[in-house]
């Protein structure tokens, strides 16, 4: 069976143009099948600020109400995702941008409230991950 590399990048890479460029060049050079997982929290916060949507955090974790969910969906699945796809395409790396919701790739359920209700924050259902 062919190897599949799953690599996640965080804000330190996304928020640094030079680091992102270097990472994506290295990622594009991987000849095996690969999946890139990314966030975009700081970008979402900056855009939210411009749109008048306040970012709320408790203990460093984002509180995701309905409006914030719309914002992060736009930023992660749209803006950041498509920027990364465009850069990879420019590096002759065929890339397709999808989210966990696309094709029912990942299912999750709302995280139970313990001490703090983080809103629309969920936990991935391991049995619900489409590995095909």
Task: Outline where the language-model segments fall.
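Nucleotide/pyrophosphate-binding catalytic subdomain
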Residues: 1-132
